[in-house]
Amino acid sequence: MSQLQTRFFTDNKKYSVDDVPFSIPAASEVQELSNVINKLLEAKNGSRSQIEFDFLVQGQFLRTSLSNHMEAEGISTEDVVEIEYVERFTAPQPEECMMHDDWISSVEADSEWILTGSYDKTAKIWSLEGKAVMTVAGHTDVVKDVAWVKRDGLTSLLLTASLDQTILLWEWNSERNKLKARHCCRGHAGSVDTIATDPTRTKFCSGSWDKMLKIWSAVATEEEEEEEEPPSRPRKKQKTEQLGLTRTPLMTLSGHNEAVSSVLWLDSEEICSASWDHTIRLWDAETGSVKTSLTGSKVFNHISYSPLCRRLASGSTDRHVRLWDPRSKDGSLVLLSLTSHSGWVTAVKWAPSHEHQLVSGSLDNLVKLWDTRSCKAPLYDVSAHEDKVLCVDWTDSRLMLSGGADNKLYTYRYTACETDAGA
């Protein structure tokens, strides 16, 4: 078929065209369609424009000719083809580069500050402009994960988790730039590799090489708690005096058969964890019982949850990013696989304000930006790092971040959410 009957539509009122059928060549690709829309806009508005657009047919981005796409997707050419168009997403633009003295294991940023953890045994607080504001030194071994707890005016609470089997709860005053360790959380019998603060900002959960998850209070108090010695393995001897008052867990969640690699809260009552035992588990935060188990075929390195699309993204040792419905009754059903990395996927993070987009980092040195409506290839490869990518983040203020084995943390500005949200 040489011609197709099409109808174009968009959510962005600024670029809307008349809702009537058009006859266009079946061999048209993205550039030709973009030219068509620009000509229609010129005729409608009287102003010449050259906007780059992307096109979706039945919810999937067009990456080939219309006829090839429709044949591959099994779409009838007899009916009028509904084609959605959006302004093309621009590539993430590198902004700042920050350095640690060793690998950067973790990053969590918000609208004001960036928090990083490193194999140099420290965490650091940075301004969004890349200025080192505070070095958080207190662990005797590698810092594996970091998390903000809450901000109350000029005072912030933050967490650092370490290979030294402890988690430190810190209080930082940004005006005076003073830092104090409030609590040393003890109870794990292995490296603490992952931490996550709950939505109420009063508790946090940790996951460890010892296969356990533990829930702790995130409220700073003046009380010392009696430490319980791990029954199975003796704790490492302390080389230095402990920072902060001892804190013990509120609850231990036992069920994984290998190391816990990633943990998050779906809401204030549900915890989700990923493990080297090839499972992702949902836990009841009140009772500590397992509610659901999702089974994969490889080690899980990292997970991220989007409340917008209610999907879980996972990164594994077989180079695939996979999407799951965490509340599915069929615990092994993968909704979508995103395949482009050539190494282990070490980190994944959903866009906080875009239900279709996520970012991934890998041992192949690349950060990839994905849109789930274009699952055959990423939107962009970001190749800033010279070594393994170990962590990624994406903030509400549309800042993307990545850290890696080149000791560097990069920030990138990405504005897709603005152009895709409508006028």
From Swiss-Prot:
Segments of this protein annotated with the region Disordered: 221-244
Pfam families per the UniProt record, alphabetical: NLE, WD40
Alphabetized Gene3D superfamilies for the sequence: YVTN repeat-like/Quinoprotein amine dehydrogenase (2.130.10.10)
GO biological process: maturation of 5.8S rRNA from tricistronic rRNA transcript (SSU-rRNA, 5.8S rRNA, LSU-rRNA); maturation of LSU-rRNA from tricistronic rRNA transcript (SSU-rRNA, 5.8S rRNA, LSU-rRNA); regulation of cell cycle
Region (Ubiquitin-like (UBL) domain): 4-87
GO cellular component, one term: PeBoW complex
First and last residues of every WD repeat: 99-136, 138-180, 187-226, 255-293, 295-334, 340-380, 384-422
Principal location class: nucleus
GO molecular function: ribonucleoprotein complex binding
SUPFAM superfamilies: WD40 repeat-like
CDD domains according to UniProt: WD40
Cellular localization per UniProt: Nucleus, Nucleolus; Nucleus, Nucleoplasm
Keywords assigned: Nucleus, Repeat, Ribosome biogenesis, rRNA processing, WD repeat
PANTHER family: RIBOSOME BIOGENESIS PROTEIN WDR12 (PTHR19855:SF11), WD40 REPEAT PROTEIN 12, 37 (PTHR19855)
Functional note: Component of the PeBoW complex, which is required for maturation of 28S and 5.8S ribosomal RNAs and formation of the 60S ribosome.
Family in the record: Belongs to the WD repeat WDR12/YTM1 family.
Oligomeric form and interacting partners: Component of the PeBoW complex, composed of bop1, pes1 and wdr12. The complex is held together by bop1, which interacts with pes1 via its N-terminal domain and with wdr12 via a high-affinity interaction between the seven-bladed beta-propeller domains of the 2 proteins. The PeBoW complex associates with the 66S pre-ribosome. Interacts (via UBL domain) with mdn1 (via VWFA/MIDAS domain).
Name by which UniProt lists this protein: Ribosome biogenesis protein wdr12
Organism expressing this protein natively: Salmo salar
